[in-house]
Design a protein with these regions (language model features):
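A charged N-terminal "starter" segment
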Residues: 1-144, 187-192, 222-228, 425-448
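Conserved, mostly hydrophobic/aromatic
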Residues: 37, 60, 82, 114, ...
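Active-site-proximal loop/turn and secondary-structure-junction residues that shape catalytic pockets
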Residues: 61-63, 84-85, 105-106, 126-128, ...
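Hydrophobic residues within beta-strands of alpha/beta enzymes
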Residues: 78-79, 99, 122, 196, ...
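Active-site loop/helix belt of alpha/beta enzymes
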Residues: 152-304, 414
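Charged (often Lys/Glu-rich) extended helix/loop segments that serve as interaction or gating elements
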Residues: 265, 271-273, 280-343, 362-448
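Glycine-biased, low-complexity coil/linker segments
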Residues: 352-357, 361
């Protein structure tokens, strides 16, 4: 479920007309719904009510401080993968004792910082990392709380770039080696064994891979509970969301279609609850995309329409530097017109355009939606049937709340877009748009 809907031919986020937000803050603009983020968090939290659990939001999905504050206030912990993410979470008011630190390449500085702040656990990805953390903690006269990330070698049925639980992936320690590594850890003076962690991938739309991984690791978890009195089992994140037809060009009931909607939160919990309940441990979850993916859109304006002998291109002001998912993964994002113009009056919309058939209700064209970046891979949609569009039209790239701005760059020396947050009938900036001066602010002339 999300809070984007059409009202009188205009797209709204909660109670805010998104066209007005675009006029106020410009485009490209990431616009997030606070209500959607909190609704998804509460649905998951309530579904797990009978289980001792902690939801640690995966900061990598969307690290905007306004989003982090929302989730902190709701009771979330945080899954962080860098010192920078820990810093962000703490600046948003997070409790370090509710933060877990993952990632295969933690640096000395990051480990020291996390120890100083008192994170709940380091998720250990290799024996080399275990030795390194023990060495650093010893030098600081501290004990580092750890959980091994165990790789169950389970096929997650997702994109190869976001599959993380197979034996050929770089993540975690093989299940068959884990017990021996735990035994080594138990003898290290600066290590405190706290739990077990797994994470098999992202954008997974079926329950079977999660259940298979849990059941595969469960015997090890039970053994470790007896031997080392571990506190928790973290099952990671990875539950997918709907990208295709995420608003179905105005349809209000896309989420009711089993064909277009992946696993629901309740279906996911119903599947994983039995094997987890039997373990009698605190369960950690690390959702990211699930909480914020459908809570955000990227607003962009059409600059030009270009036709060639083979193609019709709609060139927009957002580029692959703003949202790289289509170029990087071949990902699908629904793209819809913000205004369905039905009245010929120039007062019918903030843009002052009128006098044509409503976008989405008349003629359609097969088009490529592309950005201004100098790469053929700079596209948002290819051969997509879309309504008749023209220069100046405002479009919404749906389901852009996760892995959107956080993966943005200054490629082609393009300033980063702005971000804004909606709560009910209010919208406020949560990140200023970069200026061209910002592009060179940190550069210095070499002194030879």
């Amino acid at each position: 479920m999300h809070s984007f809907h059409y009202r009188d031919g205009r797209l709204f986020c909660e109670e805010v007309d998104v066209a007005i937000a675009a006029e106020k803050f410009g485009t490209p603009l990431y616009l997030y719904s606070a209500g959607t983020v909190l609704d998804h968090y509460r649905r998951l939290d309530e579904a797990l009510a009978g289980l001792d659990h902690l939801i640690c939001y995966a900061v990598k999905a969307n690290s905007n401080r306004a989003i982090l504050r929302l989730l902190r206030d709701a009771g979330a912990g945080f899954d962080i993968v860098s010192g920078g993410e820990l810093f962000r979470a703490l600046k948003a008011g997070a409790d370090a004792a509710k933060c877990t630190f993952a990632g295969v390449g933690k640096s000395c500085e990051e480990i020291e910082y996390a120890l100083e702040q008192g994170v709940y656990s380091f998720n250990i990805e290799s024996e080399a990392e275990l030795d390194y953390i023990n060495q650093i903690a010893s030098a600081k006269n501290q004990r580092a709380p750890i959980a091994l990330r165990v790789n169950p070698d389970v096929e997650a049925q997702t994109h190869q770039y976001i599959s993380t639980g197979k034996s050929e992936n770089k993540f975690g320690i093989a299940l068959e080696w884990a017990a021996k590594v735990y035994e080594r850890a138990s003898k290290m003076p600066a290590i405190s064994i706290r739990g077990v962690q797994m994470h098999i991938g992202s954008q997974i739309t079926e329950a079977a891979p999660f259940v298979a991984a849990i059941e595969k690791i469960a015997p090890l978890v039970s053994e470790l509970k007896i031997k080392y009195a571990i506190e928790f089992f973290s099952i990671g994140g990875g539950l997918g969301i709907a990208y295709e037809s995420s608003i179905a060009s105005g349809s209000g009931d896309w989420w009711k279609s089993q064909r277009s909607h992946p696993l629901t939160i309740q279906q996911y919990v119903d599947a994983i609850l039995p094997p987890l309940t039997r373990l009698g441990l605190r369960i950690l979850l690390e959702p990211g995309r699930l909480l914020v993916g459908n809570a955000g859109i990227l607003l962009t304006r059409v600059r030009y329409i270009k036709e060639t002998a083979q193609k019709k291109f709609v060139i927009i002001d957002a580029g692959m530097n703003d949202l790289i998912r289509p170029a990087l993964y071949g990902s699908y994002h629904e793209i819809v017109p913000v205004e369905k113009i039905t009245e010929p009056s120039p007062q019918s919309s903030p843009s002052g355009r009128g006098g044509r058939e409503a976008a989405g209700e008349g003629k359609t064209n097969k088009i490529d939606v592309v950005g201004p970046v100098c790469e053929s891979g700079d596209f948002f949609a290819q051969d997509r049937e879309m309504p008749e569009l023209r220069a100046g039209d405002l479009l919404a790239v749906m389901s852009a709340g996760a892995y959107g701005f956080v993966m943005a760059s200054n490629y082609n020396s393009r300033p980063l877009p702005a971000e804004a947050l909606v709560r009910g009938n209010k919208v406020a900036l949560s990140r200023k748009r970069q200026t061209i001066e910002d592009l060179i602010r940190d550069e210095v002339d070499p002194i030879w």
